[in-house]
Amino acid sequence: MKASIINKLDSLSERHEELQALLGDATIISDQEKFCAYSKEYSQLEEVVSTFNRWKKLHSDIEEAQILLDDPDMKEIAAEEIEANKAEIEQLEQNLQILLLPKDPNDEYNCFLEIRAGTGGDEAGIFAGDLYRMYSRYAESKRWRIEELSANESEQGGYKEIIVKISGEGVYGQLKFESGGHRVQRVPKTESQGRIHTSACTVAVMPELPESEMPEINPADLRIDTYRSSGAGGQHVNTTDSAVRITHIPTGIVVECQDERSQHKNKAKALAVLASRIVQVEKEKQAQEQADTRRNLLGSGDRSDKIRTYNYPQGRVTDHRINLTVYRLDEVMNGKIDELIQPIITEYQADQLAALSDQN
């Protein structure tokens, strides 16, 4: 492992010890804000420091075992121990490099998930409903909370568009690679000839930004319309104009929210989604301007950015970004999508490591 990496790990270990002492200080304990901040920093360093300590211990064990190589009775055991420790050290060094990668500060935030039906008419709307169910089941398995903000249901079931907020630990970091075009190939229930149709939906995942990070939005740039919201089949029809539609005139971004019975609450939620969308648009613009030659595994949420195909006749799901195919479509549609999400995260980390080594 490079000396620069070891120096970095040494400084993190020192900081970890310093934080441990601070968290036992009565003055810090009585200051709730500082105590919470230090506790968070301490827990963030825990994994990298414990991994580094294990790495150092194995090196120490190898040095001790090398002394025993001169002992005829212990030589064989010592050689086996050295070989095993070297293999573990190699794995730990890979883990440490990943742990040292720059963290996306947004990864710990809640997120807004938008699903829109694309090409394919009614079948695309039904598929949007299937995707929403898939993400809902996944969120339930993670003990995350889903809050529906806006839903435009399609006539044959499913949604023309649905926007939800998902809250929980590390939500955005887990779901951010879901942005992009999702394509389904199957025989629709309304198809009498048994022909396979291809339909598509777009998914966009954006972090819910804290107020301190929200962009300043000029009220003069907004057009705010109110209307009466209604649930499925006209249920829960409000007698007041509580639903809110906000148009950001400079970008043309439109956000609707009809979740709450209070117009004020709907407006606040719509503004939060709008702020996240504005930031996302700016990020995508910067990424295009940089014209990065590396693969951008982080989808844009653009319809043309096809990331995944769900093929029902073959029971397979293919992620086109990393050429990954799994033949467990039923499980995937029931929310078991970790086997699709984790390989993308791993590949993204590998790309980051490659970029860092190029810089060095």
Swiss-Prot record:
Region listing for Disordered, in residue ranges: 285-309
Keyword Nucleotide-binding found: no
GO annotations of cellular component type: cytoplasm
Keyword entries, A-Z: Cytoplasm, Methylation, Protein biosynthesis
Source organism superkingdom: Bacteria
Subcellular location: Cytoplasm
PTM section of the record: Methylated by PrmC. Methylation increases the termination efficiency of RF1.
Basic and acidic residues bias (residue ranges): 285-295
Modified residues (N5-methylglutamine): 235
Gene3D superfamilies named in the record: 3.30.160.20, 3.30.70.1660, 6.10.140.1950
Chief subcellular location: cytoplasm
GO molecular function (one): translation release factor activity, codon specific
Family (UniProt): Belongs to the prokaryotic/mitochondrial release factor family.
PANTHER family linked to this entry: LD18447P (PTHR43804:SF7)
Task performed by this protein: Peptide chain release factor 1 directs the termination of translation in response to the peptide chain termination codons UAG and UAA.
Protein name: Peptide chain release factor 1
Protein's organism: Glaesserella parasuis serovar 5 (strain SH0165)
Chain's gene name: prfA
